[in-house]
Amino acid sequence: MRRAATRAFRTCQCTVRGHRSLSYRANRRGSYVHSSLLQSQIPAHNQQSLRFSFTSRAPIKHAHPVREPLQSSMNARRATVALLSGIVGYGAYYSYNGNSTDTAAALTRGFSSSSSSPTNPGDAIPTRSVLVIGAEELSTGTFVGEGPISKTTDDEGRAIVEMLTADQSSQKLRKMEESFLVNRGRGVVRYDQVQLPSNNPIEDDHAEKIVEVPVRGASESGSDWMFWGVFDGHSGWTTSAKLRQDLIRYVARELNETYKAGGNSPTSEAVDTAMKKGFTRLDDEIVHHSVQEVLKSNSRSVAAELLAPALSGSCALLSFYDSQSNLLRVACTGDSRAVLGRRSENGKWTATPLSVDQTGGNPDEANRLRKQHPGEEHVVRNGRILGGLEPSRAFGDASYKWSKDIAEKLRQSFFGRSQSPLLKTPPYVTAEPIVTTTKVQPEKGDFLVLATDGLWEMLTNEEVVGLVGKWLETQSNAAPKSQFDSVWTKIFGASQKNGLPVEQGTAATGGDGQKTPIRVRQWGISNDDDRFVVKDSNVATHLIRNALGGKNEEMVSALLTLPSPYSRRYRDDLTVQVIFFGNGEKAQNQSEEVVINKDATAPPKPLKAKL
């Protein structure tokens, strides 16, 4: 019998805290709130009015930090916003109407360099850049003085937050980065990952694991089942945390049974079915088995614990690589995305999507739902399920899956929410994934990018692959510092080119429901390759930096300075994993088979004294 023994790489969950929320037009769950668009522009001769000059002699009022309970709302996927700047500004807005997205640039003067030093060489009082956050505006200005200014408010109630410097921005970007060197000689040589919160706490999560398949006989070599997954939560973090804990285990168990039943050579259809069963069985436990346990216990505390993953929701993107066959399977539930990068004969990289964004705006998904629910004209409305939920496939989201009887019983006995009056024949949302299969070519240096949808709102598939390719060129041209660096150069080569080394594909329009870089239009910035930069050792961090502005350090700093949940109007939670395939050598010692790449991993937090 061929049995699979699991070995965990690393899993991670991080929490951050932030500030008070503003109103948005629509959140992911679909409740609409009208938001006015600030269309006034400050004339050039009045821009000085947005310069806040507080000297060290002037009294400064400090607001006390307020700790909030866990936020549960996943805010605007499509929002009407305005980004207004007085001294230095950027912005654009786009409005959402029905299934179309209209974009118009406004206030596009662009970021310029701002002062963070004394106004005159002889001055002892520093001038610092600040963000001014109002109810309907965001502006930048300067603050003169030496005292702390975070959480300070002016006479009009606007919060004034000191802008992060370039170094502080890099520290924030790299705070949650991790990198691992894989020296198992089985097709994978390295993987990098990073997270950047926007919600408070972050609603994304991720998981990684090796399932080691032992040898059957002396003449056979073992193989690895390698898993990487990103989970994009909405309406809270509890569902994505549940997936981090259990999804790989459920899928590996189904795969193990399938391989045993198929004599270690199951059909491709059987493997796909096993992955789908792992997904749907876990969702059944989250949505339905939890209800049975809650009704048996008749306890509010038990209900609060067990129903939390059912009431919130999460997309899931899971990759499964079999080192023996070099087959890579990607199972997608929701709108996270996987893209494969492969070097072509001319030295450039090609970008191949391995998943499709599953939303109400995807024509195939909309047609599937209309066939499953005939006669229900509002099953997909404005690109959303029943006019509310954007992903058409997701874990949790029980209000779209429970029967009316169950939902009403839970609402009366505990604290469940009321269902939509449009709900007639649930379930409307499924966790069953779409599975794709690709033959990986480690000898060509293939790589895989997995990311939640926040990244794809800022970069195209080709830009992501080209950015990884550009980063690889920089790494390969550096002097080797170890045996791994020599192997790296052998696999990925070394070259120097201008622009991104990627084959350009057909420009995406969004008509097929696939996410396009709407944030670039929202921010009103150029979409040419000159905006990109290479300055990070972790390639996942490198992708996020360039998604936020790249060379434009002031834009990067502004987007990173924005406190949660206000930041959600301009960027989503971000989780990115990049896996590099290659025929590296196997380490002699088992303890060296998977090691932390310290050059691309955030240092551990120092231990604090208890006394």
Per-region residue spans from a language model:
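N-terminal mitochondrial targeting presequence
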Residues: 1-146, 155, 610-611
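PP2C/PPM-type serine/threonine phosphatase catalytic core
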Residues: 67-69, 103-227, 233-611
